[in-house]
């Protein structure tokens, strides 16, 4: 369940809509879209989309639209597409990282191998764009294709930065923006675009563009906070909460903000070669050293600042929409508290 979903549902329900019904429709349509693609490939695609998750991105599509009642087919298509893209990136990430667990379950690459996992991710990407294209408008496809291009660049940046002790704070956030925040931005832009189509006479074109940009900025800011908090959670664990071993980022050479800042505070960490870590126990011991520096508290403060910045970027919106989006932003932090 997405952060703050219960409170968000109550706010939106007061405006005459049922968030849970919309999200059920998203789930059902995703399941239909990945069915019928062969026994093996279809099985892994279905398992991927049914594995759960926060469904935060489709929720943002719905809330950014400002359409409280009777969401359009265009809006549902956008919500489905953005979540399928997210699922596809997770499958491909696991291939590149060699991850064996996600959400406490074996990954596709662990259970079926690299070729099958790559094909599963490709299928999810294809179904996402087919779903958008079937709506007949070019703008949603443009928004999502731009985001997928950025996702690919972010993944390559992460590979380039692997094991690199000199990754800067700026480069870390550039990578987070590409790998994570752009899809949050796309979710909000897709929602805004669908909402404007639903209300074609609602304001001048310039105002509609500013609204889309402001909502996109909101999404990008909470996406950055989301990724930073996720990186903190990799250090703090525990595995039963994260669904993966504590310190998994350290073991695959991914340098995140907690480690970058801890190296500034502890000279012994500055000389640590991540390639020397071989076991989960060794990674957990380094996590304890990172936590002892106070770097996690600093990182949390930065994430909280990003959430406050996100809320400050929201334009003047209907009360239900403003409240619901602010609750989602707060929920990103609350999930990690």
Please state what every model-predicted region is.
Residues 20-22, 120-122, 250-251, 301-306:
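Short acidic alpha-helix initiation/capping motifs at coil-to-helix transition points
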Residues 266, 270-314:
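Mobile late-domain/C-terminal helix-loop "cap" segments
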Residues 6, 306, 313-337:
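Short, amphipathic C-terminal "tail helix"
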Residues 1-33:
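N-terminal amphipathic/basic leader segments beginning at the initiator methionine
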Residues 5-13, 106-108, 164-170, 285-293:
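Short, charged, low-complexity loops and linkers
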Residues 31-268, 330:
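Mg2+-dependent prenyl diphosphate-binding active-site environment of isoprenoid biosynthetic enzymes
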Residues 16, 20, 75, 141, ...:
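Short, structured helix-loop boundary elements
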């Amino acid at each position: 369940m997405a952060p703050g979903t219960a409170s968000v549902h109550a706010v939106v329900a007061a405006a005459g809509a049922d968030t849970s019904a919309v999200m059920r429709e998203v789930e059902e349509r995703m399941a239909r879209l990945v069915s019928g693609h062969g026994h093996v490939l279809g099985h892994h695609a279905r398992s991927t989309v049914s594995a759960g998750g926060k469904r935060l991105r489709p929720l943002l599509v719905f809330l950014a639209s400002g359409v409280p009642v009777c969401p359009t087919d265009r809006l549902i298509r956008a919500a489905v597409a953005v979540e399928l893209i997210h699922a596809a990136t997770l499958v491909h990430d696991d291939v590149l990282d060699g991850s064996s667990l996600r959400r406490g379950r074996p990954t596709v690459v662990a259970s079926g191998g690299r070729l099958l996992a790559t094909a599963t991710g490709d299928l999810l990407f294809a179904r996402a764009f087919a779903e958008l294209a079937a709506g007949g408008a070019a703008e949603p496809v443009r928004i999502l294709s731009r985001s997928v291009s950025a996702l690919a660049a972010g993944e390559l940046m992460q590979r380039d930065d692997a094991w690199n002790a000199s990754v800067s704070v700026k480069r870390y956030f550039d990578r987070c923006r590409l790998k994570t925040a752009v899809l949050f931005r796309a979710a909000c832009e897709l929602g805004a675009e669908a909402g404007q189509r639903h209300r074609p006479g609602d304001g001048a074109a310039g105002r509609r563009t500013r609204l889309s940009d402001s909502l996109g900025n909101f999404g990008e800011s909470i996406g950055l906070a989301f990724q930073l908090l996720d990186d903190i959670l990799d250090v703090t664990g525990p595995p039963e909460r994260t669904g993966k071993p504590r310190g998994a980022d350290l073991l695959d050479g991914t340098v995140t903000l907690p480690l970058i800042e801890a190296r500034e505070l502890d000279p012994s960490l500055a000389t640590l070669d991540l390639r020397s870590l071989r076991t989960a126990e060794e990674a957990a011991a380094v996590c304890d050293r990172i936590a002892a520096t106070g770097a996690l508290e600093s990182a949390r403060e930065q994430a909280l600042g990003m959430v406050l910045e996100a809320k400050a970027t929201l334009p003047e919106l209907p009360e239900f929409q403003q409240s619901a989006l602010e609750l989602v932003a707060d929920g990103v932090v609350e999930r990690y508290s």
